[in-house]
Curated annotation (Swiss-Prot):
Stated name of the protein: 3-dehydroquinate dehydratase
Site (Transition state stabilizer): 21
InterPro entries attached to this UniProt entry: DHquinase_II, DHquinase_II_CS, DHquinase_II_sf
EC number: 4.2.1.10
Family as reported in the entry's similarity comment: Belongs to the type-II 3-dehydroquinase family.
Subunit structure, as described in the record: Homododecamer.
Catalytic activity of the protein: 3-dehydroquinate = 3-dehydroshikimate + H2O
Pfam families cross-referenced by the UniProt entry: DHquinase_II
One Gene Ontology term from the biological process aspect of the record: aromatic amino acid family biosynthetic process
């Protein structure tokens, strides 16, 4: 019997505030709503989905390292503000060598200059930004397609 595909969704700092934080930029959908929808989609495709959110860089790194040990097949990550600052996140993602998609609710290229650079994009399998919460659904669909190839 083959193991079910496993996808991990990682959420960075302040994403726990979705729905109440700058809804004009990030929308009104909560993180719980996003995770619930992704869970439903994953279940329908017979894929194991786990989610993790932290406001702390080291905890995100620890969880990504654990993903390798757990046999996770794909990571979907919204690194939040760490997108623009964290060489450590880049290093752990490169180190575990699990394919990943970088997701952003807002279009980081239409925002402040400092938000236009990502330390992760050039090593990501794909990048989705500016599509709001549906970006996560598209990332999940792409991950499942890639895993099941």
């Amino acid at each position: 019997m083959s193991k079910k595909a496993s996808i991990l969704v990682i959420q960075g700092p302040n994403l726990n505030l979705l729905g109440s934080r700058e809804s004009d930029v990030y929308g009104k959908t909560t993180l719980e709503d996003i995770h619930q929808k992704l869970g439903e989609l994953a279940t329908a495709q017979s894929v194991d989905l786990s989610t993790y959110q932290s406001n702390h860089e080291g905890e995100l790194i620890d969880r990504i390292q654990k993903a390798k040990q757990d046999g996770v097949d794909f990571i979907i990550i919204n690194p939040g503000a760490f997108t623009h600052t964290s060489v450590a996140l880049r290093d752990v993602l490169a180190g575990v060598a699990i394919p990943f998609t970088e997701v952003h609710l807002s279009n980081i290229h239409q925002r402040e200059e400092f938000r236009k650079h990502s330390y992760l994009s050039d090593i990501a399998t794909g990048v989705i930004c500016g599509l709001g919460a549906i970006g996560y659904e598209l990332a999940l669909q792409a991950a499942i397609t890639r895993i099941k190839k």
